């Protein structure tokens, strides 16, 4: 197949005497790949088909496995197949089905690479997959090289992962299968709209193809441009971060806040990426641009100290002019704060710990749902408002009860961890009345009249729950 030959020429690859693992599901994409490799690689190379039965569809998925095994036997291709109870793995590791399937699949590929000392893992992702992936990344707010989608060549284990079909469409591969009489299996779940990718595939991609039949080629060109730009910016960031990082070890990195904030914003964001990728071994999904900006806003604020929780036990501690990223347990620090909210217009207040309060200006008609949203007005309280940490003797007048209740007792009732109580935000009015404990309790000072033109709405966002940044930011 010319596509594979062009790919080898572009990336200066030689398959002489090497071992290649081809991921084969039994669908048209991977069967076209297996056929093309079988008729392209030299006789000195070893080609191994790798199939994973995720056990999602019982006997049907087992038939897919036998189909791949039978095809390989007929064509004289070595085949490695495995059955993995992915649903059980997902439950044990708190993953969704698709993420668990991918993790299990790539773990098997990695095992085969080691066992057979293979140089290359080759997969059948095509141009339509690339379009879907890039659109999904944009919709999620992915930053950096993740926006470039699927990489055609990247490091994998001790070798390389190759995707030679990214300039071909799904229709190209179906035509290749038809022309060469290549059998394949069809997964009925691909026709359902249960998964995000399928919704993009069924409803967005057809529209784009009507506008431009070669849209996959356009997206692949953009992906390559983005990758080249990002690699340059990453190299520049690495150079600049040498002056930002004051110390580092396997468990922690300390930086100068002043030096980080002195960098241009694109390098600040990538600097945070580099630190997280250095520290994490197996990282959750990538941060969005919003999450990165929240972190940078947090360290930009006045205040000598504070802490922020990242996924998988990573702590970030701000202390005067430095910031420490570490997996080690932090000593308790004074994280008290006291901020003013004028209520004159829309504003966002980033709090120590990474959470925030968003204020909608006077006249907001937003409906209130849950304890993360609260409305008030000059009719109910005296402005300005203040956001502070708890104080000894704090009491609050809750809706629907006589008298007042200790804030300490509310924290106990709501099972707020001891480590978070001293930094939990409390909103008061100008004379010290506690009017709201964000995320926990509302008070008698709430304004429910949406026609009140002086009404303002406050929304509490717990950004510390955001997920982490992956080492392979594309996820592919």
UniProtKB/Swiss-Prot annotation:
Keywords: ATP-binding, Cytoplasm, Ligase, Nucleotide-binding, tRNA processing
Gene name, Swiss-Prot/TrEMBL: tilS
Main EC class the enzyme belongs to: ligase
BP GO annotations: tRNA modification
Function of the protein: Ligates lysine onto the cytidine present at position 34 of the AUA codon-specific tRNA(Ile) that contains the anticodon CAU, in an ATP-dependent manner. Cytidine is converted to lysidine, thus changing the amino acid specificity of the tRNA from methionine to isoleucine.
GO molecular function: ATP binding; tRNA(Ile)-lysidine synthase activity
Source organism phylogeny: Bacteria, Bacillati, Bacillota, Bacilli, Bacillales
Record family assignment: Belongs to the tRNA(Ile)-lysidine synthase family.
Protein name: tRNA(Ile)-lysidine synthase
Domain notes: The N-terminal region contains the highly conserved SGGXDS motif, predicted to be a P-loop motif involved in ATP binding.
GO cellular component, one term: cytoplasm
Keyword Cytoplasm: yes
HAMAP family on file: tRNA_Ile_lys_synt
Subcellular location: Cytoplasm
